[in-house]
């Protein structure tokens, strides 16, 4: 019985020592991989855009954010910017990571594919995105919907 108790205590100690509030990293220096489904129904701007899309975010241990976005742009709207904002569902929030902004050429292609590396604004860390992704959303803007055309919470 004493061995069983010592074994359980040792296992609990190991778990307690290895668990932390910081996001885990994989062997490639990636702290977490997040996704956002971009639609107008998630927008707070009253957007009637017909576009929809998906963004994948990889938060790297060095603080950079890699992103890949694909937007199906059925009506040829002109997309001019994309950001990560901090706010819960249904609330507009401040930009914390610029994904692309002017002078990046605006595009009205039917299939928009964008990828790149971004750096969070001062006061925001990649670890914050990993720890509480639903507190952040991805938002893409068009010339018609400058406040945001499509949006999705990170998860």
Where are these regions (language model features)?
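Metal-centered catalytic cores of metalloenzymes
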Residues: 2-7, 12-82, 86-155
